[in-house]
């Protein structure tokens, strides 16, 4: 029973990976130019923020005005922490730590910050390219209008700030736009959205921010099936995700050690 289930799972993952590549590649010359423009623009801003301010890489590990705890946690932690709001985000910390170890010899200063900001830049820039592709392939407007709308989105204050914000939001930005494009392409080509596709996207989006797991599942209501069939399919899709999160949370709970808070006690002089 178990081998057959694993075989079905791996086959589904192969199919979804193939569809993922079809959704992301190949880029057109306009998309390549759009990517390079925003990547370089955001890169210059991120470089300035990292090396000429103390907003991102706060000295002495003190909480700064720029997102305080959240930014410091995602920039400096070596992984191993579990947050129920971001159940699979520890994978990012693990990969970031490995890259930091590998690249420390090349970048003597602020290695972790460079890696994090480069990844955030790639996610936001990639999300903008997918917005352009959605406007062209799904909405089917002219290239000029698609570029205008994409450029307008790329200049939003929120988008610019996310390009140098080491947080879960850039991941969600990219994955939600990617999910919209992938689901729209499937519905446009077949007139039906498979539960397998929604399960795949729910794991991706929900793994970064747990509430995002339900967003791809909303596409079930586009299928021309009875209402209760949609509800049953939605439950079947959400159940594996919930079980997986519960197992991971249980693992971290059992592994966790009691934390001593004595080191948080401030000297009397600091309270005056």
PLM features per residue range, with description:
Residues 79-114:
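Short hydrophobic/aromatic helix or loop-helix immediately within or flanking a transmembrane segment
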Residues 193-224, 240-241:
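Membrane-interface alpha helices of multi-pass inner-membrane proteins
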Residues 1-46:
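Start-transfer (signal-anchor) and selected internal transmembrane alpha helices
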Residues 262-268:
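Conserved small/polar residues in nucleotide/adenosyl-binding loops
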Residues 131-155:
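Transmembrane-helix signature of polytopic, membrane-embedded enzymes
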């Amino acid at each position: 029973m178990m081998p057959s289930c694993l075989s079905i799972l791996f086959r589904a993952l192969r199919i979804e990976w193939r569809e993922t590549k079809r959704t992301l590649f190949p880029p057109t010359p306009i998309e390549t130019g759009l990517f390079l423009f925003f990547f370089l623009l955001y890169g210059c801003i991120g470089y300035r923020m990292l090396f000429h301010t103390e907003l991102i890489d706060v000295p002495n590990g003190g909480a700064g005005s720029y997102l305080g705890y959240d930014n410091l946690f995602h920039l400096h932690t070596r992984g191993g922490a579990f947050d129920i709001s971001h159940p699979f985000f520890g994978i990012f910390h693990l990969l970031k730590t490995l890259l930091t170890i590998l690249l420390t010899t090349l970048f003597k200063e602020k290695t972790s910050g460079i890696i994090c900001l480069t990844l955030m830049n790639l996610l936001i820039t990639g999300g903008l390219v997918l917005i352009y592709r959605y406007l062209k392939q799904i909405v089917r407007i002219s290239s000029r209008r698609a570029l205008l709308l994409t450029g307008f989105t790329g200049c939003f204050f929120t988008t610019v700030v996310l390009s140098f914000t080491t947080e879960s939001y850039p991941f969600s930005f990219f994955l939600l736009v990617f999910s919209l494009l992938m689901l729209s392409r499937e519905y446009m080509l077949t007139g039906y959205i498979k539960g397998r596709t929604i399960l795949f996207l729910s794991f991706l989006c929900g793994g970064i921010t747990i509430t995002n797991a339900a967003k791809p599942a909303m596409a079930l209501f586009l299928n021309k099936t009875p209402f209760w069939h949609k509800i049953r399919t939605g439950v079947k899709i959400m159940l594996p995700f919930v079980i997986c999160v519960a197992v991971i949370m249980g693992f971290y709970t059992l592994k966790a050690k009691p934390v001593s808070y004595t080191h948080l006690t401030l000297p009397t002089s600091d309270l005056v």
